[in-house]
Each structure stands twice: as C-alpha cells, then as structure tokens.
Curated annotation (Swiss-Prot):
This is Methionyl-tRNA formyltransferase. Belongs to the Fmt family. (6S)-5,6,7,8-tetrahydrofolate binds at residues 109-112. Its EC number is 2.1.2.9. It comes from the Bacteria. One of its GO terms (cellular component) is cytosol. InterPro entries: Fmt, Formyl_trans_C, Formyl_transf_N, Formyl_transf_N_sf, Formyl_transferase-like_C_sf, GART_AS, Met-tRNA-FMT_C, Met-tRNA-FMT_N. It holds the Pfam family Formyl_trans_N. Keywords: Protein biosynthesis, Transferase.
Amino acid sequence: MRIVFVGTPEFAAEILEHLIKNGFNVVGVVTQPDKPRGRGRKVAPTPVKAVAEKHEVPFIQPESINKKEALEFLRSVRPDVIIVASYGKILGEKVLSLPRLGCYNIHPSLLPKYRGASPIQRVLENGEERTGVTIYKMVKELDAGPIALQKEISVDPFETFDQLEKRLIELSKEMLIEFLEKLKTGNIELKEQDHSRATYAPMIKKEDLIVDFSKDAESVKNKIRAYDSRPGARAFLGNVEVKLFGVTAIDSSGDEPGLINYIDREGAWIGTGDGKVKVRYIQFPGKKKMTFWEAKNGRLIIEGMRFERRYES
C-alpha cells in the first residue's frame, strides 16, 4: 500500500516517524513551507520535513496543496491512500479524489465534538473529562467525514496541553497502525457523524490566551493549563505582559481577583472570582521561565501585586 503523508508540526512528525519505522511504504510527504521560528526568528524546517529528509522520503512544501505543481507531485507518486495529521491547510476536492482508497485525517478529539484547528486546547479550556482521537475519511466539509476508528481517554484534572498532546500522539500512533492494517484487508466500516452534536475548536487568537482572574478558580486553572507550555497563558502586571504556567492547586477560600496573596517555594496563590489558584511559574518578557519564588527573590514580583486583564476576547 502506497501512502502519502500530509502534516506539519511535531504531532504529525512523530506519527510519520512511527509509520516509517513500522515498515509502511511512505512514498511521499507534503508539509507546509519553512517559516521563521523561535526567539531568533530563524527559518527552520517543519518537524515533518525533518523526518522526511532523515528517511529520504520525497517531499514538497507547496503554498497550496491544491495547485498544479502539488497535484502533479501527488499523481507522480501514485498513492493508494493519503494520511493527514495537523497539516494546517484545506485539501480541495481534486486532492481528496486522487487516491483510490481515499484521504483520512487523524483528529485529536472525539468527533463530532471539537471540529477545527485547536481541539486539544479547547478540551482543556472547557474542563472536559474525556477526549480521544478520531480517524475519519475526509470530505469537503471540515472534520465532517465518516468515522473509521475512534478511541477515547480520560483527561486528568491538572493535565497540561503538553502532557495531553503527548498521550494523544501515542494513541494516534497505535490507532493509525490498526487502521492501516484494516484498510489493507478492506475491513473498514465507516460510520457517519451525528452532525447535530458538532462543536467547534476555532484557531487560537491572542485574546484567547489572556487569563481573566474574575472568573471562577476552575476556569482560571483550565485557561492556564490549556496553553501550558506553548504559547503560554497571559496576564498583565501593570504594563508588563507575562506568561503563566503550572497550576498545581485550587482553593475555595476567597480572595480579590488577580491579587498575589502569598508566594512560597511551591508557587503563588492568586485570587479568582470564587477562590484562588496556585501557579508555579511566571515568565517575563525577554527572560526565561522561572518559579514565582525565584521571581520574588529577584525582586521582580512581591505579594500584594495584582494581575489584570488588558484586552477583551
């Protein structure tokens, strides 16, 4: 079975690496163009490109997978199936109709819930207790195709984005191998999604990152862990925008929203609308992430200071 893999970030790269190491015939890769990354804004290859180069798999990086040059590449490698994981761009009908077995997407949510670009973050932000991975046959509509395989896992109360993403990558690897073995033998049963139950996970905007400490402690906890460690939840100390990481506890005893009540080696207790949360790490502009205790000892922060919310979603 000839496979073309389409993806961009680390989530997709780990799945591609797993496919190749398990002996599957990956005949081509499509990933997004290289972009400036990190503090120095140096142009770096996408994680998927790095895997393709490592294993000498032919790859392209088109601005659009739907343009003539990309379609010619896809036709030239003659895929039986196209596997998509976190590509970040829409596949048009010409691409979807190209492989004889179809195009299948690996989506890290329990579809039809959380269709869209940011399912892991939205699951955490909304305090969901369960999530999972869905492999579905792609259609023109976003994340709306019939389901080939779906498995679920529980979400731990203080689990961060990084931690949950790692578990979902491992689940995706296992599921993709199972799916491809079934596809080889024609043993795939597709189940239509219940579109009436669809919810959406839109792309993250900068205002989504801002913590509103006037909300309840559970909501504040969920906001911070949803963006831990990247790109980091934001709050303001005076005119300074900082990032917050590592919520370790919540408490129902009241305090003023945003007020830094107490700092010890384990973190800072910060007031919310109905209690307080304990946050371990803070990052100031141009500095590395540090504990609140380190920030206090460095005279960057003291008890009695207050976090604010500066722009509205």
